[in-house]
C-alpha cells in the first residue's frame, strides 16, 4: 500500500480546485480480501452495495463497502463520495481510510463502528430499551453538529440528501457519525437551493418541496433530520407498511394535546418529569424542522441553539391543509414497498 493523492489516482481528468485534500491509502484488492477473510462477514447492505467487516494487519478494524453493481451511475456516486469525504473531517462524520479500484470493482474503506447503525438500535426492542433520554439527546445533538459542519463550517456547503437513522453509525460510546455521502452535493456560497434532474433519498425522509420542485437545499437535510428526531423518540418507522407516516401520527398527537404519546412507552415510564419536558421540546423542534414550507424551517444552527437554550421560546408549528407529499405524488414505486430502508431515485417530470 502507498499513501496516494486522491486526485492523482482517481480523478486525473479533473482539474484540481482546492489544495485542502485529506490523503489516504489506496488499498489493493488482495489486501482487502485478506482483511475481510475474502468478504466473509457481511455487516450491512444498502442500495449502493454491501458492507463487510475486516481487520488490517496492524489490528485496526475496518468496514469495507463494495459497490453491488458497476454502472455509470454507481461509479459516479463512488467518485462523488470520495471527492466530498476527501475534503471533510469532523468528529460526527465517518472517517474514510481509503479506497480500492480494480477493473469494475470499487470499494471504500472506513473506520469500523461497533454499534452499527442507529436504525438497528432504535428499531430493535431489546437494544432500544438500553437507550435512555440522555443517550438519545447526545445522539441527536451529535447529528446536528455534523450537519452544521456540512452546511456552514466545512466551506463546501454540503447537502447530504439522505439523512436517516440508517445513515447514522454509532461508535463504542454511542457517538453518532454521519455516513452515506453517495448522493451528497455541494452548493455555491450564498446559494439557497440548487436544481436537480432527479429526486433521490429515502421514502419518509424526503423534503416535500424538493419532491415538488426538484430544488434541493440545506433545508432538505433539516426536514430529514426532523423525521430522524421523531424516529428516535418514538421508536417508530418513518413510513409504515399500511401507508401511514410518522409525521402524520405526530401531528395528530400534537393537535390533540397528546404529544406525550409520541414518546416511546419505555422512555415515558422511566424518565423524570424534567426529562419528559425536554423530550417534548425536542418533539416541538422536530415539528418545526418538518414544516412543509422550507422557508419556515430553521437552519441547523438555530436548531442547535434551541437544543442548548431551554429558556428560548419556540414558535408554534405550522401544519398546512395539504396531505403529505408522498400521497400527492404519483411515484413510479410504492412507498409501502420501500418504507425508509433504501434510497430511491425518481426522475423529475417536466413542468
Curated annotation (Swiss-Prot):
Sorted keywords for this record are:
ATP-binding, Cytoplasm, Kinase, Nucleotide-binding, Phosphoprotein, Plant defense, Serine/threonine-protein kinase, Stress response, Transferase
Residues covered by the Protein kinase domain? 37-287
Record's catalysed reaction(s):
L-seryl-[protein] + ATP = O-phospho-L-seryl-[protein] + ADP + H(+); L-threonyl-[protein] + ATP = O-phospho-L-threonyl-[protein] + ADP + H(+)
Cellular component GO terms, alphabetical: cytosol
- Post-translational modifications reported in the UniProt record: Autophosphorylated and phosphorylated by CRK36.
Q: Which GO terms describe its molecular function?
A: ATP binding; protein serine kinase activity; protein serine/threonine kinase activity
Output the Pfam families linked to this UniProt entry.
Answer: Pkinase
Q: What is its EC number?
A: 2.7.11.1
User: Principal localization?
Assistant: cytoplasm
Q: Where is the active site?
A: 162
User: Sites of the modification Phosphotyrosine?
Assistant: 110, 210
Output the InterPro entries linked to this UniProt entry: Kinase-like_dom_sf, Prot_kinase_dom, Protein_kinase_ATP_BS, Ser/Thr_kinase_AS
Family statement: Belongs to the protein kinase superfamily. Ser/Thr protein kinase family. CRK subfamily.
State the protein's name: Cysteine-rich receptor-like protein kinase 45
Organism expressing this protein natively:
Arabidopsis thaliana
* Gene responsible for this protein: CRK45
Amino acid at each position: 500500500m502507498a499513501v496516494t493523492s486522491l486526485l492523482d489516482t482517481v480523478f486525473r481528468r479533473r482539474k484540481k480546485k482546492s489544495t485542502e485534500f485529506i490523503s489516504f491509502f489506496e488499498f489493493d484488492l488482495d489486501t482487502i480480501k485478506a482483511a475481510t477473510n475474502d468478504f466473509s462477514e457481511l455487516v450491512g447492505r444498502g442500495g449502493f452495495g454491501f458492507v463487510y467487516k475486516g481487520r488490517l494487519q496492524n489490528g485496526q478494524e475496518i468496514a469495507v463497502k463494495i459497490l453491488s453493481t458497476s454502472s455509470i451511475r454507481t461509479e459516479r456516486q463512488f467518485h462523488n463520495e470520495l471527492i466530498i469525504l476527501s475534503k471533510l473531517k469532523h468528529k460526527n462524520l465517518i472517517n474514510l481510510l481509503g479506497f480500492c479500484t480494480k477493473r469494475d470493482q470499487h470499494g471504500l474503506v472506513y473506520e469500523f463502528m461497533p454499534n452499527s447503525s442507529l436504525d438497528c438500535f432504535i428499531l430493535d426492542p431489546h437494544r432500544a430499551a438500553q437507550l435512555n433520554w440522555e443517550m438519545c439527546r447526545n445522539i441527536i445533538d451529535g447529528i446536528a453538529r455534523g450537519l452544521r459542519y456540512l452546511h456552514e463550517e466545512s466551506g463546501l456547503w454540503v447537502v447530504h440528501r439522505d439523512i436517516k437513522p440508517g445513515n447514522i453509525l454509532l461508535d463504542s460510546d454511542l457517538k453518532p457519525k454521519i455516513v452515506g455521502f453517495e448522493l451528497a452535493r455541494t452548493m455555491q456560497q450564498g446559494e439557497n437551493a440548487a436544481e436537480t434532474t432527479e429526486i433521490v433519498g429515502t421514502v419518509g425522509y424526503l423534503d416535500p418541496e424538493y419532491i415538488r420542485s426538484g430544488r434541493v437545499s440545506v433545508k432538505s437535510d433539516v426536514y430529514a433530520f426532523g423525521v430522524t428526531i421523531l424516529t428516535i423518540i418514538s421508536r417508530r418507522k418513518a413510513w409504515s407498511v399500511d401507508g401511514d407516516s410518522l409525521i402524520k401520527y405526530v401531528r395528530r398527537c400534537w393537535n390533540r394535546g397528546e404529544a406525550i404519546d409520541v414518546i416511546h412507552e419505555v422512555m415515558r415510564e422511566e424518565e423524570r418529569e424534567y426529562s419528559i419536558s425536554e423530550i417534548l421540546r425536542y418533539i416541538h423542534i422536530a415539528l418545526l424542522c418538518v414544516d412543509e414550507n422550507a422557508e419556515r424551517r430553521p437552519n441547523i444552527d438555530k436548531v442547535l441553539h434551541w437544543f442548548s437554550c431551554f429558556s428560548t421560546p419556540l414558535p408554534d408549528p405550522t401544519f398546512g391543509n395539504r396531505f403529505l407529499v408522498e400521497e400527492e405524488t404519483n411515484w413510479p414505486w410504492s412507498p409501502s414497498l420501500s418504507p425508509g430502508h433504501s434510497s430511491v431515485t425518481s426522475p423529475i417530470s417536466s413542468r
